[in-house]
Amino acid sequence: DRFYLEVQRTNRVNDEEHLHAAVALAERSGPEDLVFLYLTSHGSHDHELSIDQPRLQLADLPADELAALLQPLRDRYKVVVISACYSGGFIPPLKDDKTLVMTAARADRVSFGCSEENDFTYFGRALFAEALNETDDLARAFELAKTRVAEREQADDFEPSEPQLWAPKPVLEHWKKLRRQQAEEALSAATKAQ
């Protein structure tokens, strides 16, 4: 089963409702699961994600508050992908042995492609639309995406964003195990359907 954490913020993440949502996800998931969180937004020099919405005044989400929000999931394997300027600054507060973190840029660099007209940022397209369609190895997919982002930025004459990766071996191994299980289940289902 898949469970989703939806957080609608009007206050800081220590708000009881938001922590309750993270706790609920922790309770519904087990050690066999992997929580995959994709965040895309504008990022700031102060390592905060903009979550502002039209007609709503929402506080930005600082890196340390995202880490606090994920604390109820500290015993779960997690992949956190952040596509935003300065997103490399999210790695230090998020990194641990059960959390893989991919970011679209170094802590001191902007990333590109964030606009209403685009389906993806440069990094999002390179990772999700391209690299993960070529390999299900997360570390390899990141390297492919990083190379493609660099090529596109060079072609556009932009300063390199230099995507970052924190990839603990236990998370990579758990991901591979889950992907093998999914492949086996798909093969079994296809065989039964014939």
Sequence positions of predicted segments:
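Structural recognition of the beta-strand scaffold that forms the well-ordered cores
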Residues: 2-6, 34-39, 77-83, 100-104
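Functional beta-strand-loop-alpha-helix junction segments that form "active/interaction loops"
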Residues: 1-33, 153, 157, 164
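A cross-kingdom feature marking charged/low-complexity
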Residues: 168-193
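Extracellular/periplasmic catalytic domains that process cell-envelope and extracellular macromolecules
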Residues: 28-32, 72-74, 93-97
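Active-site-proximal C-terminal subdomain of hydrolase catalytic domains
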Residues: 79-172
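A short, glycine/acidic-enriched catalytic loop
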Residues: 32, 40-74
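Second-shell loop/turn segments in exported
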Residues: 4-13, 24-26, 50-57, 112-117, ...
